[in-house]
């Protein structure tokens, strides 16, 4: 496991957690490289179970051996960026209530024809700015 102690807030590998907007993460111009950030151990675990590929973890130092250990064991080749909670709060601009984040590759969108072939109901949502909030 590759653990990096955060010493430089401007390190480009931390951009996904500190400086990129949701629209930049979605990256419509290059969907193969689109990302999302999973925001708790439960969400990270579910995303891994669904086949999402992790890019990196941002984690409170104490969780490397604690509640993050099982997740990290599942992803031994994924870099971990760690610091104390106050440093992470300064970096992200908010308090990490569960002590960890994980940048993950956004899954490819499924073919609408396949999704609709057995559907008995269809909902059309307009002007949605953040797809992760509707849990599709």
Spans of features found by a protein language model:
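Boundary-proximal intrinsically disordered activation/regulatory segments immediately upstream
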Residues: 1-61
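Short secondary-structure boundary/capping elements
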Residues: 12, 39, 83, 129-132
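Short, glycine-rich nucleotide/cofactor-binding loops
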Residues: 31-37, 122-132
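Short beta->alpha connector loops
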Residues: 41-42, 63-64, 107, 129-130
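Short beta-strand/turn micro-motifs composed of small residues
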Residues: 59, 104, 125
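S-adenosyl-L-methionine/SAH cofactor-binding core of RNA-modifying enzymes
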Residues: 62-119
